[in-house]
Amino acid sequence: MSSTATPTPSNVVLVGKKPVMNYVLAALTLLNQGVSEIIIKARGRAISKAVDTVEIVRNRFLPDKIEVKEIRIGSQVVTSQDGRQSRVSTIEIAIRKKA
């Protein structure tokens, strides 16, 4: 399996196996640095953590200051080490500061 590492844009938070609060802190840090819009991305089992991250930022830390701009869902074909292909669900949630 060959992996090509593509650089992640500076306004993207990739959600994975860490605790949800790590991703909340990353999102809050980006917003406090002056980034007006950030994208929370996840796939597979981490999708629920991505949704939790957005909801915690929106409701607990920055109520009435953040809005969900766009939600994109899809799937990716992933090839395992033994050559089998499977589909993995993906989500991208774009949030931004209210004007």
Swiss-Prot record:
GO cellular component, one term: cytoplasm
A GO biological process held by the record: chromosome condensation
Maturation and modification: Acetylated. Acetylation at Lys-17 decreases DNA-binding affinity.
Principal location: cytoplasm
SUPFAM superfamilies in the cross-refs: AlbA-like (SSF82704)
Coiled-coil zones: none
Gene Ontology MF terms in the entry: double-stranded DNA binding; RNA binding
Keyword terms of this UniProt record: Acetylation, Chromosome, Cytoplasm, DNA condensation, DNA-binding
Residue numbers carrying N6-acetyllysine: K17
UniProt-annotated location(s): Cytoplasm; Chromosome
Superkingdom of the organism of origin: Archaea
Similarity-based family: Belongs to the histone-like Alba family.
Matches recorded under HAMAP family: AlbA
Job description of the protein: Binds double-stranded DNA tightly but without sequence specificity. Involved in DNA compaction.
Record-given protein name: DNA/RNA-binding protein Alba 1
Source organism of this protein record: Sulfurisphaera tokodaii (strain DSM 16993 / JCM 10545 / NBRC 100140 / 7)
Gene name tied to this protein: albA1
